[in-house]
């Protein structure tokens, strides 16, 4: 097994029911944060981290993802002819990425989506990046979380899962770790991984947040994994099994995480990102200040 992490897997086969009717014909991952689809943030994080090849696991009604990262000759020609070089650079940026696509024919859970990447990954360590979690998108100087996991792997040669503290009453929405003692420099040894525990049963408030660096042995486990929570093949359950034969670490993320998996999180992310966007930040800031005054006066 090579020691270098070169490949990333982005599961994008979910139905996106929380955003209906917008996602009836449009992939949820293509919903824009101001002017950039959420999946492009994920791909850019991977490339910034040094990932060389990316596999996107898609499903039905996800063709728009492939189209976004494909060339569009008519659009590119039009922008070039009109001298819109800045826009042309933005379009070119989406087509210069080494992306591959495979379809998950039946939505049987995250674990099954990752299993579709077995042939692509081969006998190499790899990263799984979930599209609902955007990391540090308003801080260009931050070290990407994926890069942090890759750096950990260079030292430990072990699977490493990203975690961060969440409110105790929200742990049932996440996979949660039971750490072995105190972490060292934000890196924890893990006793067990538990998928979506009830708050009273949660071993900690350290929740898995959508970035995983895994060794290829995970595939053999996923092939035998019985359905878990929600009657789906749960990646967290497979990682817990892996942890019984290989050490699995948890890296505590201390940056800014944005959850775009629900409407409020998506709106909050859009506002925070827009307040850093050079084309709209000033107007938006003034609007929010005025809106705040109006709302205060109505109370």
Swiss-Prot record:
Primary enzyme class: transferase
Domain of life: Bacteria
Pathway note: Carbohydrate metabolism; nucleotide-sugar metabolism; Capsule biogenesis; capsule polysaccharide biosynthesis
Database matches in Pfam families: NTP_transferase
Family matches, as CDD domains: UGPase_prokaryotic
EC number: 2.7.7.9
Catalytic activity line of the entry: alpha-D-glucose 1-phosphate + UTP + H(+) = UDP-alpha-D-glucose + diphosphate
InterPro entries, per database record: GalU_uridylyltTrfase_bac/arc (IPR005771), NTP_transferase_dom (IPR005835), Nucleotide-diphossugar_trans (IPR029044)
Segments traversing the membrane: none
Record GO terms (molecular function): UTP:glucose-1-phosphate uridylyltransferase activity
A single BP term in Gene Ontology: capsule polysaccharide biosynthetic process
Keywords: Capsule biogenesis/degradation, Exopolysaccharide synthesis, Nucleotidyltransferase, Transferase
Family in the record: Belongs to the UDPGP type 2 family.
Protein name in the entry: UTP--glucose-1-phosphate uridylyltransferase
Originating organism: Streptococcus pneumoniae serotype 4 (strain ATCC BAA-334 / TIGR4)
């Amino acid at each position: 097994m090579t020691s270098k992490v070169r490949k990333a897997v982005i599961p994008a086969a979910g139905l996106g029911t929380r955003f209906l009717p917008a996602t009836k014909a449009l992939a949820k991952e293509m919903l824009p944060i101001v002017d950039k689809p959420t999946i492009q943030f994920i791909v850019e994080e991977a490339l910034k981290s040094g990932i060389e090849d990316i596999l996107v696991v898609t499903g039905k009604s996800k063709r728009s993802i492939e189209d976004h990262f494909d060339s569009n000759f008519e659009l590119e020609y039009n922008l070039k002819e009109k001298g819109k070089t800045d826009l042309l650079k933005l379009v070119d940026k989406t087509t210069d990425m080494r992306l591959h696509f495979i379809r998950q024919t039946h939505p049987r859970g995250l674990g099954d989506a990752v299993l579709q990447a077995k042939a692509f990954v081969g006998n190499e360590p790899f990263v799984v990046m979930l599209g609902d979690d955007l990391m540090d998108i308003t801080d260009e100087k931050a070290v990407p979380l994926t890069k942090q996991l890759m750096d950990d792997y260079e030292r430990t040669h072990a699977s490493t899962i990203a975690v961060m503290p969440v409110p105790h009453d929200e742990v049932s929405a996440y996979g949660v770790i039971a750490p072995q003692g105190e972490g060292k420099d934000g890196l924890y040894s893990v006793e067990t991984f538990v998928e979506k525990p009830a708050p009273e049963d949660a071993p900690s408030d350290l929740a898995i947040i959508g970035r995983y660096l895994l060794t290829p042995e995970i595939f053999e486990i996923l092939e035998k994994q019985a359905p878990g929570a929600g009657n789906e093949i749960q990646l967290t359950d497979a990682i817990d099994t892996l942890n019984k034969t290989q050490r699995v670490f948890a890296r505590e993320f201390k940056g800014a995480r944005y959850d775009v998996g629900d409407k409020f999180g998506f709106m909050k992310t859009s506002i925070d990102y827009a307040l850093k966007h050079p084309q709209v930040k000033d107007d938006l800031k003034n609007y929010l200040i005025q809106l705040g005054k109006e709302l205060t006066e109505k109370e």
